[in-house]
Amino acid sequence: MGTRLLFWVAFCLLGADHTGAGVSQSPSNKVTEKGKDVELRCDPISGHTALYWYRQSLGQGLEFLIYFQGNSAPDKSGLPSDRFSAERTGGSVSTLTIQRTQQEDSAVYLCASSL
């Protein structure tokens, strides 16, 4: 069996609306084999126009990956390689895809939203 990678997907809130609803991420955790593709989904707080993806590797600080703001072109400056991609459909749900996973991809992946 190939090397297994652990993708802990956590959620992070940058503010919350008056109802207390928060960012939703799925899956909440993901274990995969090296070389497999992984897709992570983020559903932001209703009404929030900005969406961010970060990751945190063991013993490291948060690392910015990508930022979406409304209908503007995303800031992809933090994506570590062409194996990483993200999209946001309809100004709402975002999907982060990691193709051909490697050992160094093992991290906590976080999504946040804001006004």
Swiss-Prot record:
State where the protein is found.
Cell membrane
Quick check: keyword S-adenosyl-L-methionine in the entry?
no
The answer to keyword Membrane applying to this record is: yes
Q: Which cellular components does GO assign to this protein?
A: plasma membrane; T cell receptor complex
Q: Supply the alphabetized keyword list.
A: Adaptive immunity, Cell membrane, Disulfide bond, Immunity, Immunoglobulin domain, Membrane, Receptor, Signal, T cell receptor
Q: Which residues form the Ig-like domain?
A: 22-115
Q: InterPro entries this protein is in?
A: Ig-like_dom, Ig-like_dom_sf, Ig-like_fold, Ig_V-set, TCR_beta_variable
Q: Tell me one GO biological process term.
A: adaptive immune response
Q: TM spans, by residue?
A: none
Signal peptide interval? 1-21
Source taxon at top rank: Eukaryota
Instruction: List the disulfide bonds in this chain.
Output: C42-C111
Self-association and partners = Alpha-beta TR is a heterodimer composed of an alpha and beta chain; disulfide-linked. The alpha-beta TR is associated with the transmembrane signaling CD3 coreceptor proteins to form the TR-CD3 (TcR or TCR). The assembly of alpha-beta TR heterodimers with CD3 occurs in the endoplasmic reticulum where a single alpha-beta TR heterodimer associates with one CD3D-CD3E heterodimer, one CD3G-CD3E heterodimer and one CD247 homodimer forming a stable octameric structure. CD3D-CD3E and CD3G-CD3E heterodimers preferentially associate with TR alpha and TR beta chains, respectively.
Described by its record, this protein's role is as follows: V region of the variable domain of T cell receptor (TR) beta chain that participates in the antigen recognition. Alpha-beta T cell receptors are antigen specific receptors which are essential to the immune response and are present on the cell surface of T lymphocytes. Recognize peptide-major histocompatibility (MH) (pMH) complexes that are displayed by antigen presenting cells (APC), a prerequisite for efficient T cell adaptive immunity against pathogens.
Q: Which PANTHER family match?
A: T CELL RECEPTOR BETA VARIABLE 7-2-RELATED (PTHR23268:SF108), T-CELL RECEPTOR BETA CHAIN (PTHR23268)
Tell me what this protein is called: T cell receptor beta variable 7-2
Q: Which species is this record about?
A: Homo sapiens (Human)
What's the source species' lineage?
Eukaryota, Metazoa, Chordata, Craniata, Vertebrata
